[in-house]
Every structure is written in C-alpha cells, then in structure tokens.
C-alpha cells in the first residue's frame, strides 16, 4: 500500500522516485513478529502450568490486543515494531496453548480432526485478511492499512468470548491435584453425568497415568531431554517436525508465489494473495477428513513426497527453460506452486500441530510443546528475515529466484525419512496410551500395529511398582523378589494410593492368556 510506504518509508525510493520500504526495514518488520512468537511460546509453558491453559490463553490474547493497538496507532517504525513484537508474544502463547487445550479436552476419536481445525482457522484468517486488503486498498489515507490492523482485534475478541464459556482442561486440573474439579470439567466436555461409568474410568486413567509419570522423574525442563519413557526422543521428534514444517519452504512459497502469477495475467498483488489463500483454505479440509482414517505418519510422508516433487520440478523447469519458453515456464510454476500449497495445507500444515500436541506426557506437556513450537518460530524468523535478501536483486542480495526450490525440495526429502524413523502413529489411542506405546514399541515404523493391553489404573489396582514390575504372586511376575506385595504409588501433591494384592484365581481364559503382558521391567527408559 502506498500510504504504508509513505508513512514508514525512510530513505529508499523505487525506480519512479517514490518512497518505499528498504530491504533491511522490510526484513525486520516482517521478522520481528516471529521473534515475538518464539518468546511467547517459551513463556507459555511456565505460565500455562501455573495459571492454567485457559487463563494463560486469555493473557496471551490480551497481550496480542495490546500489540494490535500499538500497530494501529503507530506513527513511526519504532512503534510499529514494538506493536508487532507484542502481538508476536501473544501469538506465540496462543500457538502453544490452543493445540494443547484441544488435545487435552478432546476424546481420542476426534482429537486429530479437532486439532487440525486449528490450522483451518489460521488459513481462514489469512483468507479474510486478503479480502480486507482488497476492500481497503483503494483508500487514499492511512485508513488503508490501519483498518486491516484494527480488524485483528475481532478474532481476538471472539476467542476471548469463547474462553469465558469453556472450562479448564481436566488433565491440567489433575496435574494440580484438583481431581474433583477435573471430574466436573470432564463431565461438561463429555456431556455425561459425573457418575457415568465411562467418565469415571477416563478420569481414573488420567489420574493414574499422571501419578505413574511422576514416579519416573520430575516435571522439569531437564526432564524433557533426558526423562523416561523416551522423552528425549519425543522432544527431538516434536522439534524436528516443527523445524521441518518451516524448512519445507511454505512461508517462502506463500510470499514468492505471488510473482508467479505475473506470467498468468494476474497483475494485482491483492488478487494474487486472494487466489493463494483460497487454495490454502480449500486444501486444508481434506486433511481434517482423513487424518483419523489414514493416520499421522501416512499423511506426513505423502505430503513431504508431494512437496518435494513439486519443488524439484519448479526449480528444474526454471533452470532448464530459456526466455523463448518463459510463458510455458510461468504456467508450470503457477501450477506446481498451487499443487505444493495443496500438499502442505492438507498434511504438514495441520498434522504437525496434531502430533506435537499428543506425544508428550502430561507432566511436561506444556514445557515440551513450548520448546518445539519455539523452534518453529525461530526458523520462521530466520526465513522471514532472509527472504527479502534471497529474493532481491542488486548489491547485498542473492537473487536466487525459483532455484531456491532445490533447497526446499531437499529438506522435503529429508522430512520423509525423518517421519519414517521418528514419528509414532498416535491416532485412535488416548493420550495416556501413547505413553504405553513409547514404552513398548522400540521403532516408529512398528507403531501402527500397537494395541493397548493394560491401563495405568490397572497397574495401581494390581499393586505394580513404580518401576513397572508386577507384584509378588502375580501371574505376570517372572522373577522372585523379597519385597512386599503392598505397593505405594503416588506423588507429593496428592495422597498416595496403596494397592493390596489379593488372592487371584490361577485359571485364566484363552483370551486373557493371549493378551500382551504389560511387563516393562526390561524397557530401556533412556533416549
């Protein structure tokens, strides 16, 4: 917008002599939001574990609103930067806590679809912003950019209104030892009476799982890298997915693809942005529909392969064709750019948020997710800051053009191998059963065949020890110990549970004998 350039342009001018935003100013204006989001993501963990998911979300929205007001009122670049930094802190908190809240309150059969809706909401917001920009583009005063900046407050206020009606997540309440409140929260979310057997069983499993987790180690930041079971592996998986989401080049593509439409006869940058965002929204919907049926691993690998093919083809065509085939080359770039956006929006866009909100145990879920989300925003900052230099021409700029897609394509190929080796299939099992899967399944590529065979409540009821050893005289006990059959399993914030081993009938049915025994005595709890 010319009004924005005139307000915040300083010394740089375009070929016609009009003020424009210098490359270095453009880089910092765009990238400082990502710096704020990285900070906000890291702050979300201690605040979310202290105040709760819901209250911290409200706080994050408030910080975002303050940043938006700064941007609307900005008369100079410094105030605009301060506003974007504050808004980024708010967005960072929201980006951690919304998927976290969704995963902790959703039943397992719709958890993936519900968290995918987070990404759908982002794409709808991008589309709405494109429409607003088209409407205000022809205004001849600062309202041309102040109105779009002010309208950021609308979704923030809608989110605030919704949060005032929603309960705190039952898992956070269990973490704080407020089990009665957790039952009431779960009752509201499931629309079941608090005495309903299914609700009672679910709450008991959450409580038992959390107490078991605490016997394996504290809920510290160190624990997310070295704790049991395999927390280092899980943290590496989450951070790797979040960084690879950025290294697929999607933000670079969303920025650079507008230039491809020049060769397709589309001149307005606002119309280009609208077309791209329509593709983005429509493409997100298939991911919501198939994530529970196809699973997380398959979607991620299909998406990475599809993006790799598109990007390598774009780079190859641009390198191989000369000026005499420029029109054909531009058409190919537009086509494969759109297909690439489809593959990302239906797979890596939503599914990464689903996986990273599921794979961590309750005791460190907020901390681990904040670290993985911060890694996403750090890469986002680096790419946003460097993009103008990679795209620009002249001294100090790389002028890569579409050849940069060779790099993004290579990262997409790396992403396929990363998913195959590191990402466990978490669909159709509860968050508590994911802990069991990481204990029993050594390799991610075997995780799809995993079937839960026991519950943490069962372990407490039958007197299992904190090291996951069955009690003496239990039919699954394979070693003789001199310890008592009475086993206490608890945590410092709540009363301990003492389970007494009763006399059991030695005769078991064939179906019971065929169950995989929950023996975890020889499990390697290291990374």
Describe each PLM feature range:
Residues 188-202:
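Short intracellular "coupling" helices and adjacent cytoplasmic loop segments at the cytosolic face
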Residues 1-187, 194, 210-527:
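Alpha-helical transmembrane bundle of multi-pass membrane proteins
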């Amino acid at each position: 917008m010319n009004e924005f350039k005139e307000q915040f342009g300083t010394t740089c001018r375009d070929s016609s002599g009009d003020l424009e935003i210098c490359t270095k100013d453009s880089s910092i204006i765009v990238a400082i939001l990502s710096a704020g989001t990285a900070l906000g993501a890291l702050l979300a963990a201690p605040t979310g574990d202290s105040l709760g998911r819901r209250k911290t979300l409200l706080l994050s929205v408030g910080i975002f609103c303050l940043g938006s007001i700064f941007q609307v009122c900005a008369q100079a670049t410094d105030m605009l930067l301060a506003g974007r930094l504050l808004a980024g802190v708010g967005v960072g908190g929201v980006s951690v806590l919304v998927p976290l809240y969704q995963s902790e309150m959703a039943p397992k059969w719709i958890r993936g679809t519900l968290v995918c809706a987070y990404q759908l909401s982002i794409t709808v917001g991008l589309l709405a912003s494109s429409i607003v920009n088209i409407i205000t583009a022809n205004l001849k005063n600062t309202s041309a950019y102040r109105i779009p900046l002010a309208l950021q407050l609308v979704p923030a206020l809608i989110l605030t209104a919704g949060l005032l009606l929603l309960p705190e997540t039952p898992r956070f309440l269990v973490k704080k030892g407020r089990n009665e409140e957790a039952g009431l929260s779960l009752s509201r979310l499931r629309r079941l009476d608090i005495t309903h057997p299914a609700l009672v069983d679910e709450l008991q499993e959450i409580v038992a799982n959390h107490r078991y987790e605490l016997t394996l180690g504290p809920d510290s930041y160190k624990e997310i890298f070295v704790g049991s079971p395999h927390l280092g592996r899980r943290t590496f998986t989450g951070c790797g997915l979040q960084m690879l989401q950025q290294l697929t080049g999607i933000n670079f593509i969303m920025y650079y693809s507008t230039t491809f439409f020049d060769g397709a006869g589309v001149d307005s940058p606002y119309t280009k942005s609208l077309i791209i965002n329509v593709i983005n929204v429509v493409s997100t919907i298939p991911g919501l529909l198939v994530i529970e049926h196809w699973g997380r691993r398959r979607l991620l690998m299909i998406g990475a392969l599809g993006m790799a093919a598109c990007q390598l083809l774009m780079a190859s065509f641009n390198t191989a064709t000369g000026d005499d085939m420029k029109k054909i080359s531009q058409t190919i770039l537009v086509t494969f750019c759109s297909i690439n956006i489809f593959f990302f929006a239906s797979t890596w866009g939503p599914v990464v948020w689903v996986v990273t909100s599921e794979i961590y145990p309750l005791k460190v879920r907020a901390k681990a997710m904040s670290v993985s989300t911060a890694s996403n925003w750090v890469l986002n900052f680096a790419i946003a800051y460097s993009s103008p230099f990679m795209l620009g021409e002249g001294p100090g700029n790389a002028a890569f053009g579409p050849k940069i897609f060779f790099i993004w394509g290579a990262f997409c190929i790396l992403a396929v191998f990363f998913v195959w080796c590191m990402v466990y299939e978490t669909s159709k099992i509860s968050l508590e059963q994911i802990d069991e899967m990481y204990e029993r399944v050594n390799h991610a590529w075997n995780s799809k065949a995993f079937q839960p065979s026991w519950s943490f409540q069962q372990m407490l009821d039958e007197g299992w020890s904190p090291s996951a050893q069955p009690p003496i005289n239990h039919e699954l006990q394979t070693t003789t110990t001199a310890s008592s059959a009475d086993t206490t399993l608890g945590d410092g914030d709540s009363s301990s549970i003492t389970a007494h081993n009763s006399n059991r009938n030695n005769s078991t049915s064939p179906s019971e004998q065929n169950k995989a025994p929950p023996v975890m005595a020889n499990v390697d709890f290291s990374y």
